[in-house]
Amino acid sequence: GDNWSAGTTMELQFESNSTDDLTIDQNTATIASNSFTERKLELWFSNNDLGKIYLGQSSAASDGTMEEDLSGTGVISSSGYSGLGGSLAFRVSGSQGVSTGVTIGDLFSAQNGLNRDDRIRYDSPTFAGTKLSTSWVDGDEWDLAARYGREFDGTEVALAAGYWDASPTAQKTGYGMSASAKASFGTSLSASYSSEDIEATARDDEEFWYVKLGHDFEMTSLGGSAISIDYSQTEDQ
């Protein structure tokens, strides 16, 4: 009937010098796998009244719940620090470039839910700006997520929260949330917080928090511009 639709999503990539693989002392022209890899490869079935089901490789329900950001600068500045230079190593202070062996990816983690994987996912219809999601991921992982987006008198608001259980594969569970608001004059404020319980070790929970102040404007007739400043902290990574 008119309420039903079905389709497939196929998204492949050929990475060359991926931002999370580059190093300061890299001595090769490129870092690449010399092959295509899958990002998304799934079937989906959608009903206007019942929601949407996905089968295959793509984002789990909680993927991205730490990244609500209305600043317009997310492509280069986001809570996912490890994806923007995660292999860059810190240097020993006062040395001639001696590496500590500790990288950005070792110290910073947004704990951004379960990522892309083979899964079954369900998204509810959107009610009053709210959408609920859940997925079961290969390896008996599972998660829950909620997302909300509305506009109030010219102010945009976006919220997301998630819980994930990766106990069978990574011996951890976690939860996180993010929020972003953008005023009609272009200034935005975004924030996120997450915590993961590492079950296999007797240590404190990993915690992450992040804040960003942004502003977008039209500097020239060529189009819009956006700037932002952000700060984050990861504990017990």
Stretches found by the model and what they are:
Residues 1-143, 147-153:
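Outer membrane beta-barrel
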Residues 144-237:
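Detector for outer-membrane/organellar transmembrane beta-barrel domains
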